[in-house]
């Protein structure tokens, strides 16, 4: 195929994309560049320009990048503590990762993020400070993927106008998404990561189409504060850590911030087998190991060791929410 035909196909793609963007000039230009680079990557990999344009069809964006960002969300009950618990160099950030068979192609991952966000509009937001509480505000902007350069779960700058409560990173064959816990919990984060990787694989041509749940329109229930609907079932958290004195552990806190990185390799099958032999769940077995480790790290014979464990309330209260919806057990 001639260079002129390739350029013509690319021009049609970018023209169609431009009609679906109502962004500031700089961000519009960056997003057009994202799609151009993704198309060039696909054609370099041997894909015909017409098929590359079909995979990157801007119609899949819907009107997401044309919308007016006039919606805001109060924090759900579980999320209110996270802004208040932030300190210099620490905030409640968690990470989920997926490992691919080959190295990540950044151009396609960036395009995959653009296609994934319309399915998760609650994630296209920023954190704002209100008179009494923080809240989450919708934004219409370009979100960017980046190479991984920092320690996992580093604090996020949520103070600026271009801030966001999640980030997408890549390193070799790993795709990682980190979330400020104010935005979502493990269930919502896993749904987002699964959709993102699925979209990436579709762009690569490894799968023909994405699952129906991702293609469907966002469900309003996904952004609900489920605690309000199930207040009676969730009840009140019990007791916290107040009461008897706690055991003091030996040693000093590590200086690495936000965390020291330790890697453990476990055989999931063997772990489940060990739990069954003790008539316990995997969670209960690991908590028992942690309790024994805490005892071993203490010189004191008296005092309580209590561990608070988040429980996914979706197992007990039927909700599709992608926001934080745990209760804690101890």
Predicted regions and their residues:
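Acyl-thioester-dependent acyl-group transfer interface
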Residues: 1-134, 140-167, 178, 263, ...
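Structural preference for long, well-ordered alpha-helical segments in enzyme cores
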Residues: 105-119, 189-199, 271, 282-294
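Hydrophobic/aromatic-lined pockets within catalytic cores
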Residues: 121, 184, 197-204, 276-279, ...
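Conserved catalytic-core segments centered on acid/base and nucleophilic motifs
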Residues: 175-177, 182-183, 271-285, 293
């Amino acid at each position: 195929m001639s260079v002129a035909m390739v350029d013509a196909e690319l021009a049609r793609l970018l023209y169609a994309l431009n009609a679906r963007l109502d962004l500031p000039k700089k961000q519009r230009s960056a997003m057009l560049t994202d799609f151009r680079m993704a198309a060039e990557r696909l054609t370099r990999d041997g894909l015909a320009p017409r098929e590359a344009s079909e995979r990157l069809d801007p119609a899949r964006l819907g009107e997401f990048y044309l919308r007016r960002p006039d919606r805001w969300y109060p924090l759900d009950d579980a999320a209110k503590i996270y802004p208040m618990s932030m300190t210099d160099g620490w905030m409640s950030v968690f990470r989920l990762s997926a490992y691919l068979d080959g190295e990540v192609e950044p151009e396609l991952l960036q395009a995959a993020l653009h296609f994934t966000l319309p399915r998760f509009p609650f994630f296209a937001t920023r954190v704002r400070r209100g008179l009494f509480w923080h809240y989450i505000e919708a934004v219409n902007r370009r979100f960017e993927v980046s190479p991984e350069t920092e320690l996992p779960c580093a604090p996020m700058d949520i103070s600026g106008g271009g801030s966001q409560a999640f980030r997408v990173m890549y390193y070799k064959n790993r795709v990682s998404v980190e979330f400020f816990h104010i935005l979502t919990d493990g269930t919502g984060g896993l749904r987002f990561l699964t959709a993102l990787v699925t979209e990436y694989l579709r762009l690569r041509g490894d799968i023909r189409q994405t699952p129906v749940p991702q293609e469907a329109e966002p469900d309003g229930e996904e952004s609900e504060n489920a605690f309000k609907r199930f207040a009676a079932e969730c009840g009140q958290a019990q007791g916290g850590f107040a009461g008897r004195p706690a055991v003091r552990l030996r040693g000093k806190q590590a200086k690495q911030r936000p965390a020291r990185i330790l890697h453990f390799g476990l055989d999931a099958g063997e772990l489940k087998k060990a739990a069954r032999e003790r008539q316990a769940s995997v969670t209960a077995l690991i908590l028992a190991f942690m309790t024994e480790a805490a005892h071993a790290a203490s010189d004191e014979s008296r005092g309580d060791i209590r561990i608070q464990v988040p429980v996914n309330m979706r197992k007990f209260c039927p909700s599709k929410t992608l926001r934080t919806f745990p209760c804690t057990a101890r």
